[in-house]
C-alpha cells in the first residue's frame, strides 16, 4: 500500500511540475485493452499540433496516469500542455469486447482547458477504440475521439479525430506508442504523438 501511495504522489508531482515546464490537445495513446487490475500506468508523450492554413506547428507534451480498477475497467487522469494552453481531464474506459485477436473499448470523461488570454472551456470526452495484435508484442489500434466543449461566456464547439496508432511492448513493464490524430472538422487540429508508457506493477 505504501508503494502505491508513493507512486500516486510521484505521478501527481509530475503533472504539477509539467505545468511549470511547458505551456493541450488530448491524445488517445493506448490500445483497446484496459490497464491490468491493480496496476498503475504513467505515460509521457511529446506531441506536435500541426499548423492549419499555413500556420506554424506547435510542440507540447501530453501525459496519462491510470489505474486498473477491474479486469475490464480503468480510470486515467490526463493532462497536456502547449504554448498558451493547458488541458486537464480524466476518463473511465470499459473493455467491452475481448476477442481472440480483436478488442474494443469505449471511454467517457471530462476536461477543462485553460487558454492564455481567455476563452477557457470545459467539455465531455468520448472515445471508441479497437485493436488487434498482428505479431507478438505489437498492437495496431484505431479510434474515434470526440470532445464536446463549452466556452466560458461563449459558444460551443466539437473536436473530432480519427486516430490510428501502434503500441509495442518493449519489456514487461514498458510500452512504446505512436499515433496520428486526423482532424475531422474545422475546429480540430491534426496531431502526432509518440512516447512511452510505464507499468509499475505489471
Give a label for each model feature.
Residues 62-81, 87-93:
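Transmembrane beta-barrel domains of bacterial outer-membrane proteins
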Residues 26-35, 39-56, 67-68, 96, ...:
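Outer-membrane beta-barrel transmembrane domain signature
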Residues 1-34:
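Cleavable N-terminal export/targeting peptides
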Residues 9-11, 71, 176:
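Enrichment for repetitive, rod-forming helical segments
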Residues 1-2, 39, 76, 177:
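Generic N-terminal leader/processing signal
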Amino acid at each position: 500500500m505504501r508503494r502505491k501511495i508513493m507512486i500516486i504522489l510521484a505521478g501527481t508531482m509530475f503533472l504539477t511540475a509539467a505545468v511549470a515546464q511547458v505551456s493541450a490537445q488530448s491524445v488517445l495513446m493506448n490500445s483497446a485493452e484496459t490497464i491490468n487490475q491493480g496496476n498503475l500506468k504513467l505515460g509521457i508523450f511529446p506531441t506536435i499540433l500541426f499548423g492549419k492554413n499555413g500556420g506554424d506547428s506547435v510542440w507540447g507534451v501530453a501525459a496519462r496516469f491510470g489505474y486498473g480498477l477491474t479486469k475490464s475497467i480503468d480510470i486515467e487522469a490526463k493532462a497536456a500542455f502547449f504554448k498558451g494552453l493547458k488541458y486537464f481531464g480524466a476518463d473511465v474506459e470499459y473493455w467491452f469486447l475481448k476477442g481472440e485477436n480483436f478488442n474494443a473499448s469505449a471511454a467517457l470523461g471530462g476536461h477543462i482547458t485553460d487558454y492564455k488570454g481567455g476563452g477557457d472551456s470545459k467539455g465531455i470526452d468520448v472515445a471508441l477504440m479497437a485493436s488487434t495484435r498482428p505479431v507478438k508484442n505489437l498492437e495496431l489500434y484505431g479510434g474515434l475521439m470526440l470532445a464536446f466543449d463549452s466556452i466560458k461566456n461563449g459558444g460551443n464547439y466539437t473536436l473530432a479525430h480519427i486516430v490510428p496508432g501502434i503500441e509495442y511492448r518493449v519489456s514487461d513493464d514498458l510500452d512504446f506508442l505512436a499515433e496520428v490524430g486526423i482532424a475531422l472538422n474545422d475546429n480540430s487540429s491534426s496531431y502526432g504523438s509518440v512516447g512511452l508508457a510505464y507499468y509499475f506493477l505489471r
